Design a protein with these regions (language model features):
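Conserved N-terminal helix/loop that builds the PLP phosphate-binding region
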Residues: 1-76, 502-522
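Conserved PLP-binding active-site segment of the aspartate aminotransferase-like
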Residues: 11-12, 417-440, 455-489
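Short, solvent-exposed loop/turn segments at secondary-structure junctions
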Residues: 13-18, 147-149, 175-177, 231-234, ...
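Active-site PLP attachment segment
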Residues: 16, 277-339, 473, 484
């Protein structure tokens, strides 16, 4: 079946909702910025650069004159909130916004705009750290999404001699496919150590937990770095306090220079989420993307966060002198004291060839959108939006399981953006181990996926991501409610076929003629 013949792809990760309010505010900001541009210079389709002096008062006047413009009320609320919380100079802040949305200049600083960094740091602190923020500050580098951020991190760690070919890099598996593939690229050649989650049977969809003995692999000082997606993808539980405490203990004792890369893109879907970047701040690079929460995959909005007091800067300072001299030559065009250049700033330079470093950094309109998403979230309207999208994925999971006649244990720590249905586990739960063995010996793990596609023209990819072979990965965020119900129903139909084939097979152990389950209507 060709890709074009599929009517629905059930594994794509981008959500089918968008945050409309911040986008309206963005466009309103654009109209204000264009008025400011024409104020400076007006000609046919030509304007000037917005002027800083007095722009704050002009913004207030502009808002009063355009009460009916969509987004203007939210834009004004965002600006007011930022001024009240961070005590920004009004002209400086409003000018940064107007200049950013116009997109007429390079990002300066290249790492992130000054006011934007304060605001995004505030957003991350609220959503990722909650009531237990780490002491000190975290510096940010705005990137073209989380995948780009991950590539920048690996590349810069290698260029700065923190990682080398053959080093051991751990992955908290199952994990997002690029985290599996990137360390194995010839350019890096890392030895991958899997820290594998186990699946407790529970009821229905299996629950994922990291056993102590698996997490203990990180205590080996030869393991230089560990990558985690928290909450997970595609199984979506958080790592949990027990795992976080074990990692903290490992860093405090056996492996104090273990580096942690945590991708927390799904954190906003879990009430009370707490990032490893708060638990182990000195060792952790926080990677975050706005794509899933705000429905903005196409915007490519991501960020890397690194605590100002971190072990990477210490490790660079402790490099052999010959290596430090070589790095000094690499970065000497940036600063008269290249040996003091922080890793977070090296990331920016390394994201481009050093010579055209002035092209580094996320585009200004992207940073303006990031700022408005962040400020929106910190307002009451943003918190109501957050609860609504959480309800959306919870409801879709319930409908999927209802259609399939499957069950899952209640877990308010599950993000629910994705779900991975372990079909072999469900077969064993309902019909016993002999039925599960029959499936495993008789069919390829991808067989239920192809049967589902043939029945429905729905492409539901295998679980993959180093997860169980006999699994189906469903993106609840990208499916309508009724699609979830229908996919669940057709999965049940597929299993009824398997049960019928099992009962017709030589010496079947199952009750002949039993209606299959999951999917068996009782």
């Amino acid at each position: 079946m060709s890709e074009s013949s599929f009517s629905l792809y059930a594994g794509r990760g981008n959500p089918n909702w968008t945050a409309t309010g911040p986008r309206e505010a963005f466009h309103a900001l654009g109209y204000f910025a264009l008025d400011e541009s024409r104020r400076v210079w007006t000609a046919d389709n030509l304007g000037g650069t917005p002027e800083r002096r007095g722009i704050g008062e002009r913004f207030d006047s502009w808002v009063r004159r355009h009460p009916q413009l969509p987004g203007v009320e939210l834009l004004a609320a965002c600006v007011q909130y930022a001024l009240a919380r961070w005590a920004f100079d009004k002209d400086e802040f409003v000018h940064e916004l107007a200049d950013a949305v116009t997109g007429g200049t390079y990002p300066v600083p290249g790492r992130m705009l000054t006011h934007a960094e304060h605001i995004v740091r505030g957003y991350l602190g609220f959503e990722m750290f909650g009531t237990r923020p780490p002491k000190g500050d975290m510096s940010l580098f705005a990137t073209e999404g989380a995948a780009a951020a991950m590539c920048y991190v690996f590349d810069s760690l290698v260029k700065n001699g923190i990682l080398a070919k053959g080093d051991k890099v751990a992955l908290m598996a199952p994990v997002f496919t690029p985290y599996v593939e990137v360390p194995e690229l010839d350019a890096y050649g890392f030895e991958v150590v899997e820290v594998r989650a186990s699946r407790s049977a529970g009821t229905g969809v299996r629950q994922w937990h990291y056993p102590r003995e698996e997490v203990a692999k990180l205590a080996d000082p030869a393991v230089r770095l560990v990558c985690a997606v928290n909450p997970g993808n595609p199984p979506s539980p958080v790592l949990g306090d027990r795992v976080a405490e074990q990692i903290k203990e490992i860093v405090a004792t056996a492996n104090p220079r273990l580096l942690i890369v945590t991708d927390d893109v799904y954190g906003t879907f879990v009430p009370g989420f707490h990032s490893l970047a708060a638990d182990v701040p000195r060792n952790t690079l926080l990677v975050y993307s706005y794509s899933k929460h705000f429905g903005c995959t196409g915007w490519r909005l991501g960020v890397i966060g690194l605590h100002d007091d971190n072990v990477i800067d210490e490790m660079i300072a402790d490099l052999p002198q010959e290596r430090k001299d070589r790095l000094a030559r690499r970065y000497r065009s940036l600063t008269p004291e290249p040996e003091k250049l922080r890793f977070i700033d090296r990331l920016v330079t390394d994201s481009r060839p050093v010579a055209p470093r002035h092209t580094a950094g996320l585009s200004l309109p992207q940073q303006a959108m990031m700022v408005l998403f962040s400020l929106f979230d910190l307002l009451e309207e943003g918190q109501a939006y957050k609860e609504r999208v959480r309800q959306i994925v919870r409801q879709r999971l319930e409908l999927l399981l209802e259609g399939a006649r499957m069950k899952t244990a209640d877990d308010d720590r599950r993000a629910g953006h994705y779900v991975e249905l372990d079909l072999l586990a469900e077969a064993e739960r309902v019909h016993g181990k002999e039925f599960a063995d029959f499936l495993e010996k008789t069919y390829e793990p991808s067989d239920p996926v192809f049967r589902l596609a043939a029945r429905t023209s729905v492409a539901a990819p295998p679980g993959g991501f180093d997860g169980p072979e006999w699994s189906v990965r469903i993106s609840l965020a990208d499916l309508d409610d009724m699609d979830c119900l229908k996919i669940g129903h057709h999965l049940g139909e597929v299993f009824r076929e398997y049960v019928a084939e099992w009962t017709r097979s030589p010496s079947p152990r199952g009750p002949a003629g039993e209606a299959g389950h999951p999917g068996a209507a009782r």
